[in-house]
From Swiss-Prot:
Gene of this entry: adrF
Domain of life: Eukaryota
Keywords linked to the UniProt accession: NADP, Oxidoreductase
Reported function: Short chain dehydrogenase; part of the gene cluster that mediates the biosynthesis of andrastins, meroterpenoid compounds that exhibit inhibitory activity against ras farnesyltransferase, suggesting that they could be promising leads for antitumor agents. The first step of the pathway is the synthesis of 3,5-dimethylorsellinic acid (DMOA) by the polyketide synthase adrD via condensation of one acetyl-CoA starter unit with 3 malonyl-CoA units and 2 methylations. DMAO is then converted to farnesyl-DMAO by the prenyltransferase adrG.
Record carries keyword NADP: yes
Residues annotated as transmembrane: none
Residues in coiled coil: none
Transferase as UniProt keyword: no
Name this polypeptide is given: Short chain dehydrogenase adrF
Binding residues for NADP(+): 11, 118, 150, 154, 183
Length: 255
């Protein structure tokens, strides 16, 4: 029997990229999933009886509570929360950053995951079990990978991850983070390249080029690689891994 058989997961950002890869892999291993995304759910997921979906904006005040209540109504419990949804920021430096970009990045990349954790923790405490996995980035541990808003949002999420891990470690609840390298998903394509801070990008180009070289040599990180790590962290095989920040980037994080 699969280690994920019948476990119940909430997966945000499940309509594309890493979220889609994770939901697809989890379903193939017998998990029950509530997917959440601002976009429509792919037919490849909705055809599964064990997949339920909410199309919602995670920054709306009522959404986190709605997500958790729906999961309990559909499946009766919550074994794992995977906070995968996120946006980029145009690589804006602090002196080119707009208020709108700062607020959107923080709202989606930091505030929404924290509010979802706030909603699931009481249920996990009652169950005396649960695993939360937050998705970071190279920018979660470095200042030379993205713009100031994205970098701040991912650093903040790593701090929240560690705090939650420590606070609830005696209650059977774990909280970890996975930091992907440059995975080819729609997150970059969703932004307008004409608005990017090209001067800021130029200062990071040697870092980005080092990672791009891996892809050219067939060593690039794929969404499925991230999914494998995420699902390991919600499985019983990782029961003593708690508060970890795990890069999945073929050593990009050592730069």
């Amino acid at each position: 029997m699969s280690l994920l058989q019948d476990i119940v997961l909430i997966i945000t950002g499940s309509a594309s990229g890493i979220g889609l890869a994770t939901a697809t892999a989890a379903l193939s291993q017998g998990a029950k999933i509530l997917g959440v995304d601002v976009s429509w759910a792919p037919v490849s997921l909705t055809e599964h009886a064990s997949y339920k979906f909410i199309q919602a904006n995670l920054t709306h005040e009522a959404t986190p509570k709605q997500v958790v209540e729906t999961c309990i109504k559909e499946f009766g419990r919550i074994d794992g929360l995977l906070n995968i949804a996120g946006i980029m920021d145009q690589n804006s430096s602090v002196d080119s950053l707009t208020d709108d970009m700062w607020e959107r990045c923080i709202a989606i990349n930091l505030t929404a995951p924290v509010k979802l954790m706030r909603e699931v923790i009481p249920i996990m405490r009652q169950q005396k079990s649960g695993s939360i996995v937050n998705v970071g980035s190279k920018a979660a541990t470095s200042g030379a990978a993205s713009g100031v808003a994205y970098t701040a949002s991912k650093h903040g999420l790593m701090g929240a991850t560690k705090n939650v891990a420590w606070r609830y470690k005696q209650e059977g609840i774990r909280c970890n983070a996975v930091c992907p390298g440059g995975v080819p998903t729609g997150i970059v394509q969703a932004s307008d390249p004409t608005t990017w801070d090209k001067d800021a990008l130029a200062t990071m180009s040697h870092i980005h080029q080092a990672h791009a070289a891996d892809r050219q040599e067939g060593l690039g990180v794929e969404a499925e690689d991230i999914a494998n790590c995420l699902l390991f962290l919600v499985s019983s095989q990782s029961k003593r891994i708690n508060g970890a920040i795990i890069p999945v980037d073929n050593a990009w994080s050592v730069i």
